Amino acid sequence: MFTINAEVRKEQGKGASRRLRHANKFPAIVYGGTEAPVAIELDHDKVMNMQAKPEFYSEVLTLAIDGKEVKVKVQAVQRHPYKPKLHHIDFVRA
């Protein structure tokens, strides 16, 4: 089972996403269920190591969003066109 630490994003938009990526983080979103969608930021290197395992895409993951645990599954992943970098992940609540 994977547990990923996340923080709620304070800023949104292209400029804010670029600043996150330069700080070795990247944006993501959690949606689904009865709760409102939540924009989050994740540590790039930690998630990159986890996503190398095939179970990352098929199992239920635990996101610790500012201390609150949420069960999610990966819905979509956006990657850099030629660098081994993640740009964005969509999570759906499990």
Swiss-Prot record:
<keyword id="KW-0694">RNA-binding</keyword>
<keyword id="KW-0689">Ribosomal protein</keyword>
<dbReference type="InterPro" id="IPR020055">
    <property type="entry name" value="Ribosomal_bL25_short"/>
</dbReference>
<comment type="similarity">
    <text>Belongs to the bacterial ribosomal protein bL25 family.</text>
</comment>
<protein>
    <recommendedName>
        <fullName>Large ribosomal subunit protein bL25</fullName>
    </recommendedName>
</protein>
<dbReference type="InterPro" id="IPR029751">
    <property type="entry name" value="Ribosomal_L25_dom"/>
</dbReference>
<comment type="subunit">
    <text>Part of the 50S ribosomal subunit; part of the 5S rRNA/L5/L18/L25 subcomplex. Contacts the 5S rRNA. Binds to the 5S rRNA independently of L5 and L18.</text>
</comment>
<dbReference type="GO" id="GO:0022625">
    <property type="term" value="C:cytosolic large ribosomal subunit"/>
</dbReference>
<dbReference type="GO" id="GO:0008097">
    <property type="term" value="F:5S rRNA binding"/>
</dbReference>
<dbReference type="GO" id="GO:0003735">
    <property type="term" value="F:structural constituent of ribosome"/>
</dbReference>
<keyword id="KW-0687">Ribonucleoprotein</keyword>
<keyword id="KW-0699">rRNA-binding</keyword>
<dbReference type="Pfam" id="PF01386">
    <property type="entry name" value="Ribosomal_L25p"/>
</dbReference>
<dbReference type="InterPro" id="IPR011035">
    <property type="entry name" value="Ribosomal_bL25/Gln-tRNA_synth"/>
</dbReference>
<dbReference type="InterPro" id="IPR020930">
    <property type="entry name" value="Ribosomal_uL5_bac-type"/>
</dbReference>
<dbReference type="InterPro" id="IPR020056">
    <property type="entry name" value="Rbsml_bL25/Gln-tRNA_synth_N"/>
</dbReference>
<comment type="function">
    <text>This is one of the proteins that binds to the 5S RNA in the ribosome where it forms part of the central protuberance.</text>
</comment>
<dbReference type="GO" id="GO:0006412">
    <property type="term" value="P:translation"/>
</dbReference>
